[in-house]
Design a protein with these regions (language model features):
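Alpha-helix capping and helix-loop boundary segments enriched in small/acidic/polar residues
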Residues: 68-72, 139-140, 161, 245
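Short beta-strand/turn micro-motifs composed of small residues
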Residues: 37-38, 96, 153
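Active-site segments that bind and position negatively charged phosphate/pyrophosphate groups
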Residues: 199-256
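Residues that form or flank phosphate/diphosphate-binding pockets in enzymes
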Residues: 45-46, 102, 161
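ATP/NTP phosphate-donor binding region
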Residues: 1-91
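Solvent-exposed alpha-helices and their adjacent loops that cap or buttress functional pockets
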Residues: 4-5, 29, 84-87, 108, ...
């Protein structure tokens, strides 16, 4: 099941053949040694199977498994990951959710390596993103990096993720209604930078997510793939805008 995700100019495949397709992508780029970054849960969910796919393709890999939950994007975790980035490593592949992806994105960016994102849950719109939120000296700070060079996911793995993670992804998408309205108001009232094409795409994503919502009470693999595709499209809106403003507004604020 190959998904064509609109407005995303990189290879994106959500299918049961994701692992072998990733191996084919690496060979097409002349990459023979990969760093696989995961945590304990995501290693069991898909990291181990991906290692087997890489081995069958005669590709070398080193694996950094971040243990001792919760895994947060702190300086300690970043340093732990960097230790695995030896000179012979030619690309970085994150296998996991938002935090593992953020660390992997930062690692690849600073290490000047290609970055491949392998989501194990349809939980956030940051899989296709330029920002890496890190916790530096106890304060969350978003470091601007670059989007992944490719994205692969297995819908069976997405479906097996905790239901709360899919709910998080759906909530992220429905919240785009608020961020879309905020962005339009900002353009009208304060002359904020604005792109009507991206605005239309974001509104369409929010509407499609609401239509998808009833199916997620008892989702199929296709439903999980559709949810991830919408999250990727939302991320593409931010990449094309060069900032998170289109998809991040008052829906991200807390009232105390």
């Amino acid at each position: 099941m190959l998904r064509d995700v609109e407005h995303v100019p990189i290879p994106v495949e959500v299918s049961s053949d994701a692992g072998s397709s990733l191996a084919d992508f690496l060979r097409s780029r002349g990459i023979s040694r990969l760093l696989v970054l995961c945590d304990g849960n995501t290693y069991r969910a898909y990291g181990e199977a991906l290692e087997a796919d890489l081995e069958r393709a005669s590709l070398s890999r080193a694996t950094v498994r971040l243990e001792s939950p919760p895994v947060l994007a702190t300086e300690e975790r970043v340093v732990e990951s960097f230790i695995g980035l030896s000179p012979e490593i030619e690309a970085v592949c994150s296998v996991g959710g938002g935090t593992v992806t953020d660390i992997g994105r930062f690692l690849a960016h600073r290490g000047k390596r290609p970055f491949i994102s392998v989501p194990t849950a349809a939980s956030v719109d940051g899989f296709y993103s330029i920002g890496a939120p890190l916790i530096l000296k106890g304060v969350k700070r978003t470091v601007i990096c670059r989007p992944p060079d490719a994205l692969f996911a297995d819908p069976a793995v997405l479906l097996q993720a905790p239901r709360s993670l899919s709910a998080s992804g759906l909530g992220d998408l429905i919240g785009k209604i608020t961020s879309w309205a905020d962005w339009n108001l900002g353009a009208l009232l304060w002359d904020e930078p604005y792109d009507p094409g991206i605005s239309d795409r974001l509104r369409d994503i929010a509407i499609r997510s609401m239509k998808l919502a009833p199916r997620l009470s008892a989702p199929s693999q296709k439903d999980a793939a559709d949810l991830l595709s919408l999250l990727i499209e939302s991320g593409a809106c931010m990449v094309d805008a060069g900032e998170s403003r289109p998809a991040s507004g008052a829906d991200r604020k807390s009232v105390v």
